[in-house]
C-alpha cells in the first residue's frame, strides 16, 4: 500500500 493509505 502507498504511504498514507489507511484501510478500514
From Swiss-Prot:
One GO cellular component term: extracellular region
Keyword Secreted: yes
Annotated keywords: Amphibian defense peptide, G-protein coupled receptor impairing toxin, Secreted, Toxin, Vasoactive, Vasodilator
Described purpose of this protein according to its UniProt entry: Produces in vitro relaxation of rat arterial smooth muscle and constriction of intestinal smooth muscle. May target bradykinin receptors (BDKRB).
GO molecular function: toxin activity
Organs and tissues of expression: Expressed by the skin glands.
Organism name: Physalaemus signifer (Girard's dwarf frog)
Domain of life: Eukaryota
Subcellular location: Secreted
Family of this protein: Belongs to the bradykinin-related peptide family.
GO biological process, one term: vasodilation
Cystine pairs: none
Name recorded for this polypeptide: Des-Arg9-[Ala1,Thr6]-bradykinin
Coiled-coil ranges from the UniProt annotation: none
Secreted listed as a keyword: yes
Amino acid at each position: 500500500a502507498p504511504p498514507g493509505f489507511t484501510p478500514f
